[in-house]
């Protein structure tokens, strides 16, 4: 049985898993140093950044990381064009299945403009501020290490750290 946003209980559990793993998944979703410049961009003159900075969800509201525009589906708005599509999909599926298996509750949707009301929600988890922080979250996450295999995660982190060193 769904609710006013039109998702089933299982879909909410899936959503809960994705929200729970967002910080480590950010290493896949936003795999470059410049990715975090987009996430942490200051608001434009219009008052929007068009990029989420908090781990939150809502209805048809683009100011949140996840929006539910229509019954039966949700849109994950975090990743950028540099993401590896295979790691992205595998990460979302792994996190979502973890949410289903553990019956994770995503909490209530936040039905406000997060660009103007973010300060009203100081307890919301924030997205990582830089790639190094996202990689640390990934390295600390046992669920994704189990889903991908520890050697895959370690190799990915090593590669990204080499890219960071080359960039600097």
Task: For each feature predicted by the language model, list its residue ranges.
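Acidic, glycine-enriched catalytic cores built around paired aspartates
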Residues: 112-168
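Active-site capping/gating regions of soluble enzymes
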Residues: 1-110, 118-124
């Amino acid at each position: 049985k769904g609710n006013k946003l039109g998702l089933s209980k299982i879909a909410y559990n899936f959503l809960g898993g994705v929200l729970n793993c967002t910080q480590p998944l950010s290493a896949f979703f936003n795999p470059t140093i410049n990715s975090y410049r987009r996430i942490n961009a200051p608001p434009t003159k219009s008052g929007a950044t068009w990029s989420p900075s908090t781990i939150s969800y809502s209805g048809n509201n683009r100011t949140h990381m996840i929006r539910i525009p229509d019954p039966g589906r949700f849109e994950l708005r975090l990743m950028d064009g540099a993401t590896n599509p295979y790691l992205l999909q595998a990460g979302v599926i792994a996190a979502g299945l973890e949410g289903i298996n553990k019956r994770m509750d995503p909490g209530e949707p936040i039905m406000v403009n997060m660009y103007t009301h973010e300060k009203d929600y100081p307890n919301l988890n924030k997205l990582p501020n830089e790639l190094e922080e996202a990689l640390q979250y990934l390295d600390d996450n046992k669920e994704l290490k189990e889903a991908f295999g520890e050697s895959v995660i370690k190799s990915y982190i090593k590669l990204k750290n080499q890219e960071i060193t080359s960039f600097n």
